Amino acid sequence: MAKFKDTDLELTRANDEMRDVEVELNFTPNALASVLYKQGDTVILACCTRARNLPRWFPRDATKGWVNAEYSLLPGSTDSRFQRERRGAKGRTYEIERLVARSLRAGIDLEELGPHSLTVDCDILNADGGTRCASITAAMIALRLGVRRLIDQGL
């Protein structure tokens, strides 16, 4: 079992021991789809929303859709207050947003999506390591639920 101390954080989980995972669907009522995802002590709220228009850079006569992602650590999600990022994502946050968005687009047929633009927001409520992987998983669940709702609505 791995046991080491890094400041005041002590990890006693074995290297091959899985973290507990909990998924609560439809956590927020206003999003197209939402997921409260817990992986160990990491907690993420992923919400899928539909934009009225495709991105400005998309061709006007586009028949395929687009999926984007946003990622944000809430100020109280880490052991010391995380400063909110203003005027767009920077550095680490931007890299994670791109990773999540590309992962989502790799798992969906944008042609089948039709001319819809979906954004999945991943808000980290508590960060305890593994936020990238947990965000991708939570975002994919929210995207899947959102697409299912669009299909059910006949869109």
Report the location of each language-model feature.
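Short, Gly/Pro- and small/polar-rich lid/capping loops
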Residues: 1-38
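Flexible, glycine/charged-enriched surface loops at secondary-structure junctions
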Residues: 7-20, 110-117, 152-155
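Short, structured patches in soluble enzyme cores that scaffold and shape functional sites
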Residues: 25, 41, 73, 122-124, ...
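Glycine-rich, flexible beta-strand/loop modules in the N-terminal catalytic cores of phosphate-handling
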Residues: 27, 32-113
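A short glycine/serine-rich beta->alpha loop
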Residues: 85-89, 122-131
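Generic beta-strand or strand-like secondary-structure segments
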Residues: 95, 99-103, 119, 138, ...
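Glycine- and Gly-Pro-enriched alpha-helical subdomains that act as flexible
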Residues: 130-155
